[in-house]
Curated annotation (Swiss-Prot):
Belongs to the YdiV family. Acts as an anti-FlhC(2)FlhD(4) factor by binding to FlhD, decreasing its ability to bind DNA, and thus negatively regulates expression of flagellar class II operons, decreasing motility in nutrient-poor medium. Required for resistance to host phagocyte oxidase. This is Anti-FlhC(2)FlhD(4) factor YdiV. InterPro entries: Cyclic-di-GMP_PDE-like, EAL_dom, EAL_sf. One of its GO terms (molecular function) is cyclic-guanylate-specific phosphodiesterase activity. The lineage of its organism: Bacteria, Pseudomonadati, Pseudomonadota, Gammaproteobacteria, Enterobacterales. It comes from Salmonella arizonae (strain ATCC BAA-731 / CDC346-86 / RSK2980). The keyword Protease does not apply. Interacts with FlhD in the FlhC(2)FlhD(4) heterohexamer, inhibiting its ability to activate transcription. Pfam families: EAL. It comes from the Bacteria.
Length: 237
């Protein structure tokens, strides 16, 4: 996809791994970076997304679905989960556009990730768009603890999976109370979703601390994103 910002950027898609406590692959999030045509400048989606038009966001979502289609047998064969971020501007279109809905619904291993800044998230199941999405697709809250939402949507049971925000984790990682605090979160939230995940695992020391805490999967700089050509390496032991 080509995005028109201060100059033209093209999207490049990668797979960000999530591992279990034994460092075995559980799932992959499809993420995008944006590069200038000469490759001299690269930016992550977080910096580019606020400047994308609805049409560009739609094209990027479709591009991710198309990539997922090319490697769906890998996900099925290895029983992996795929996560795609669902921008608020696309969530309504997904429910209204039958072709887009069908393309996303064909993948039984796909879960849609939304962030805490999703409009009306604090209304929980009273948010009709969010409630309808949860009826048709497994949802993951991608950055719980970012401080932009209450827990109502979680306790309303709208999310199959919840990922703790990487900044939330890294701000607390050096505290003596880190482990007890994580245990408290797991105890409070685990009954409202199928599994809890943790981001911000950037080194072996952090992995050693987080692995025993009861999270189903861990994500972070310890397992960097890979292109589609390197997927097979993630399941080779």
């Amino acid at each position: 996809m080509i995005a028109s910002l201060d100059e033209l950027y093209h999207s490049e898609l990668f797979f960000l791994p999530a591992m279990d406590k034994n460092a075995r692959l559980v799932g992959l999030e499809i993420i995008a970076t944006f590069a200038t045509e000469d490759g001299a400048v690269r930016m992550p989606t977080e910096l580019v997304a606020p400047r994308l038009s609805v049409e560009e966001q739609y094209c990027l979502f479709v591009e991710k679905l198309a990539l997922l289609e090319t490697c769906q047998h890998f996900f099925i064969q290895h029983k992996l989960i795929a996560w795609l971020n669902l921008p608020p501007a696309i969530s309504g279109l997904l429910l209204l556009d039958s072709e887009l809905f069908s393309r996303a619904a064909r993948f039984p291993f796909l879960e849609l990730a939304i962030n805490e800044n999703y409009p009306g998230l604090n209304h929980g199941k009273e948010n009709e768009t969010l409630a309808h999405l949860a009826m048709h697709f497994p949802l993951m809250l991608a950055n719980f603890g970012a401080g932009e939402a209450s827990t109502k949507a979680i306790f309303d049971g709208l999310f199959k999976r919840i990922m703790l925000d990487k900044n939330f984790i890294q701000q607390r990682a050096d505290m003596i109370s880190f482990e007890p605090f994580m245990h408290a979160i797991v105890a409070q939230i685990s009954s409202s979703c199928e599994s809890l995940m943790i981001a911000g695992i950037d080194n072996e020391a952090m992995f050693a601390r987080a692995a025993p805490l009861g999270f189903s999967a861990l994500q972070g700089g310890l397992w960097p994103p890979v292109p589609v050509s390197q997927l097979i390496r993630l399941v080779q032991r």
